[in-house]
Amino acid sequence: MKFRFPIVIIDEDFRSDNSSGLGIRAVAEAIEAEGFEVLGATTYGDLSQFAQQQSRASAFVLSIDDEEFTPGPDLDPAVVNLRSFIEEVRWKNADVPIYIYGETKTSRHLPNDILRELHGFIHMFEDTPDFVAKHIIRDAKKYLEGIQPPFFKALLDYAEDGSYSWHCPGHSGGVAFLKSPIGQMYHQFYGENMLRADVCNSVEELGQLLDHNGAIGESERNAARIFNADHCFFVTNGTSTSNKMVWHHTVAPGDVVVVDRNCHKSILHSIIMTGAIPVFMKPTRNHYGIIGPIQKSEFEIEAIRAKIRANPLLSHVDADTVKPRIMTLTQSTYDGVLYNTETIKEMLDGYIDNLHFDEAWLPHAAFHPFYGKFHAMGRKRARPARSVTYSTQSIHKLLAGISQASQVLVQDSQDTKLDRHLFNEAYLMHSSTSPQYSIIASCDVAAAMMEPPGGTALVEESILESLDFRRAMRKVDEEYGADDWWFQVWGPDELDEEGIDNPQNWVLKRTDAEGVQRSDGEDSWHAFGDMARGFNMLDPIKATIITPGLDIDGKFGETGIPASIVTKYLAEHGVVVEKTGLYSFFIMFTIGITKGRWNSLLTELQQFKDDYDRNQPMWRCMPEFCEKQPLYEKMGLRDLCQHVHTLYAKYDVAILSTDMYL
């Protein structure tokens, strides 16, 4: 199919009637005559914003004017602008073609750091516009073909082929929908391409998901390389299924298994299905309802053996000789708490054969140095001597996968290689023979998007946006002052004023830098108690917003604003959050986040504060809620908040829920 990737030309004479303008427009017209779109601009404008076009452009043509050059090219405004623009583009995109277009200047007039990033140097009036256009288009086409990962490229080729389909699915490339009025709506909503690409495993050129061959197998191997794994298996029905695959491959009835008690339901289902006998590692929890990490001491081999001895279901087992088959850890928690996986590997290597990190919420961490060793598999890390490492990741949660896109990553140990045939038996057990190819394509594309430098830039943008949001929230709080109220964002007290924060600020510890409790016994910001040095950190892209009314010790204030009312208010005003607690709600800064989105959230929180302070009637500020719950329509917003807050305080719900959990 024809994609819209214009060739971007930046020339201050693009719209002028002088010879330079006539020359560059002649090239643009020749490019358009070949079927490519041209986007012309006369200035670089905001360099960083214009460079965002790198994701939409098939090539850049940057004009340099002779009169702009003066002695000392490193200081010339033309060179400075050129260098800045190229750096911005290359920060995200190492491959998009960049051409320089000029009258008499040659490569000897430009510094080498600029030259090495160029695909060509075009001289005005030397070659015909048609030849120049063909030369640029050749590289543009090569670039667009080169960025297509294996399976997505094969799927595009198949959809373009126009073959008649005599296999399932029954809608036959969407044709069946065209025979019904409601089907017409469905077809128009999803579009031709999605339906033409919805095929079955009879299409040999696409490969077989269940056999991991052909284009699909090539894509899985490519993803394994990008994610620092030895093996990758795409999963089309979510990480719930990925977890079950790992367990059915590694665990047999009666096996002892070590499990994070803060595990996903799929792990509990895996325990039931495999007939394993679990011992649980107990996490912490603060009174905001935020589940914290498991203490490092619980990962000690002797601590695990003590749990085995204490388990009545394992009374027949010799705790000193039995080896648990698998350890499964939620990495990260829903709220963003991470573990130093290298420390865990060192502690358990050889004692537990299979180390499984459920990284449903952490597929992005491998692509930015901010996360250090706080994710399962990283570049240039020593692999365990005996234990095989598994990571199950939800590509759809924080990367650019569509819903249910997941993958299993496996890293061999030094002396144990994954038995792929045996693993595939578990894979077959949990996979459909009719997988959704759009999900496979999104796994393939999501992996390609994370290839550095693009992936690193995407994650860095997420981190920067989350930090800027936190800074903006603190600024609002400071301006309101101590006599007024505002929402807080849970996280470290120290925050750098600009840029990427120091990762050490996000490591969970007591106030003391050595991880030692302060002499006054005061907890640090997380309230999870003593933390082993360097063992846990908070992912900054996971933001928990705290509403007034409850402190970190579980004590209720005289007034309060339950989070459930805030999030219902936000939903009515076009802001939908990830989850809601008693006095907190949770948002994520994924790679799809924008400044407009988080600034809109902040302004809606301002609007809530105004309505709360004025005690606006519910029928006015939350009409949809009142339509379903007319009992509250005559109440004021502040009155309703106080009513629910009083009930929470009366029954001490924060302490009660913590006690129930622990």
Residue ranges of predicted features:
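Conserved acidic segment of CheY-like receiver
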Residues: 3-31, 40, 60, 271
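Non-catalytic terminal extensions of PLP-dependent enzymes
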Residues: 5, 29-32, 46, 51-60, ...
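Short acidic, S/G/P-rich loop/turn micro-motifs used as interaction or catalytic elements
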Residues: 13-22, 64-77, 104-107, 333-337
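Short beta-alpha junction loops
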Residues: 13-15, 100-108, 127-128, 360-369
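Short helix-loop-beta junction
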Residues: 26-37, 226-227, 275-277
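Conserved PLP-enzyme active-site core in the AAT-like
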Residues: 41-44, 49-53, 74, 87, ...
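Conserved acidic residues
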Residues: 56-59, 118-123, 130, 230, ...
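Long, structured ligand/cofactor-binding scaffold of large enzymes
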Residues: 182-279
